[in-house]
Design a protein with these regions (language model features):
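Acidic, glycine/proline-rich low-complexity segments that act as flexible tails and inter-domain linkers
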Residues: 1-56, 108-140
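Mid-chain, well-packed structural core segment of small domains
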Residues: 68-93
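A generic structural signal for short
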Residues: 66-68, 136
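Short linear loop/turn motifs
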Residues: 95-99, 130-133
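Short acidic alpha-helix initiation/capping motifs at coil-to-helix transition points
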Residues: 33-40, 69-75, 103
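A broadly conserved amphipathic alpha-helix scaffold signal in soluble, globular proteins
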Residues: 80, 97, 113-116
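Substrate/cofactor-recognition hotspot
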Residues: 98, 103-106
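Short, structured motif recognition centered on aromatic/hydrophobic residues
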Residues: 57-65, 96
Length: 140
């Protein structure tokens, strides 16, 4: 397979999914025929329209990846696509909140970090040095 064909496939993948990861480039460069079969599987189970719409599938991706403690940047990619597909920042946050018990606080934290970074949420500065820092204990 040519480099040109691999590049075209990766551009098409990015257009359909809304993102590409480093692993996609490696897979396509190493074995484009297999990567295309994998892409067909992803289309059938994830990006293709069936009963669940893409927004719902992205919410599921976000909470599952948070539960599995995926890399924050990977979770952010799905937060970004969910927003593009019409999810509100509050819906994404609620999806993460709804599964905190079964997935645990550590996984929730990773999902929350991805959500805050992608939605430009400005958290309270907990260092005690910034303008949004909480007041010292006893001075509320």
């Amino acid at each position: 397979m040519s480099t040109e064909e691999t590049g075209a496939y990766l551009r098409e993948m990015h257009q359909k999914r809304g993102y590409t990861l480093e692993m996609h480039g490696i897979m396509a460069a190493a074995d484009l025929a297999w990567a295309k079969k994998y892409g067909d599987f992803i289309e059938a189970t994830y990006t293709g329209q069936r009963l669940l719409d893409r927004k719902t599938k992205e919410l599921l991706q976000i909470v599952v990846e948070a539960a599995l403690r995926a890399d924050v940047d990977q979770i952010r990619a799905h937060v970004r696509v969910a927003l593009q597909e019409g999810a509100t920042p509050q819906e994404i946050l609620e999806a993460l909140e709804a599964v905190i018990m079964p997935m645990g606080a550590l996984a929730f934290r990773r999902g929350l970090q991805a959500w805050a970074a992608e939605t430009s949420f400005n958290p309270i500065d907990m260092s005690g040095e910034g303008p949004t820092s909480p007041p010292p204990l006893g001075e509320e």
